[in-house]
Amino acid sequence: MSAVFADTSFYLALLRGDDPVHSRALAELRAGHSIITTEFILLELGNACARATDHADFLALVAGLRASPRATIVPLGSQLLDQGMQLMGERQDKDWSLTDCISFIVMKERGIHDALTTDKHFEQAGFTTLLKQGAD
């Protein structure tokens, strides 16, 4: 099975049972994909889980990712950060976040076409979003 990129919205959907794509996120998790994500995504997720009541679930999710043979977490690094900022500068016509730009670079470098995300910016960058809302 080919690798997919996991974005912040995928992890939030897994953690929040009331999320509109929670069921689809669970189904994708159970599908057995090899998952690629970045420490930038985990940083963004950690910020989204800032409420004390979310800490345990966030930490458990990260521990599970680190332990999973199906998951690869691309580390933070100055070169990747610089590449993301360069792409952001090149695409000032788009409302892409720095984390989005870094994700796109990782996906292109690894030949990944599919993203576990609800974020339309991935489609703007030429990728397929597997959790597109309203796709049921």
Regions found by a protein language model. Give the residues of each.
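Short loop->beta-strand "edge-of-pocket" segments that line small-molecule binding or catalytic clefts
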Residues: 34-36, 69-72
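Active-site neighborhoods of divalent-metal-dependent phosphate/nucleic-acid chemistry enzymes
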Residues: 72-114
